[in-house]
Amino acid sequence: MKTIDIGPDGMAEHIVRRAGWHPKQGNYTELGIPTEAYEMLTAKTLYTLLAPGNAAGSHQFTSAKGPDGLSISIAECPPGDGPMLHAHMETHEIFFCLEGRFELRWGDAGEHSDVLDRFDMVDVPLGVTRAFRNIGDDTALLLVIILGGNQNDIGYARSVGDEVAAKYGADVRDAIEAHTSMKFNVGAE
């Protein structure tokens, strides 16, 4: 078996340093999506550290390009913050608590819950509606790993799309569906 030698410059393309993290929320304002509307659906701050080289939608703004089917992000959540209930139908989403405590809710109405403490992890099965929320008093960090080929499969209930439209306008709801991985189609056949 022959190995390859990429040298320091080649390896530098694969190293993601903390100074190179960029929140992806602000990237959508030019596409008609106010930061506040994006944050209504997601964690307060999301840093995509690694995404497939062909990434689109919500994974197009990344610190480094990686293998197909793998995205790694950090969700930084102030107290009480986290995404709304959503589902992934084709990708596994794995949460690993780095700092703080997170309530994990699942079920179509978030009727089930458990708590992730520091270094706890959960692999949420395909098709299960889920959300997490920082239940601590300080900003908390959650490592988010997404595995699977179609990473544009983030679904929210239609009622969530209606909430976005009521608060920010139908054009913002439509821009979210057009320019991110998020759709308001959970519960649709």
Label the predicted regions.
Residues 2-8, 131-189:
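Double-stranded beta-helix
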Residues 74, 87, 106-108, 134, ...:
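Residue-level recognition of conserved beta-strand positions in structured domain cores
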Residues 82-85, 90-118, 128:
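A short beta-strand-loop-beta hairpin characteristic of the jelly-roll/cupin
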Residues 75, 95, 122:
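Conserved GNAT-family N-acetyltransferase fold
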Residues 1-69, 174-189:
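A short, N-terminal "cap"/entry segment at the start of jelly-roll beta-barrel domains
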Residues 51-60, 73-88:
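Conserved short histidine dyad/triad with adjacent acidic residue
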Residues 78-80, 116-136, 145-147:
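Conserved metal-binding segment of the jelly-roll/cupin
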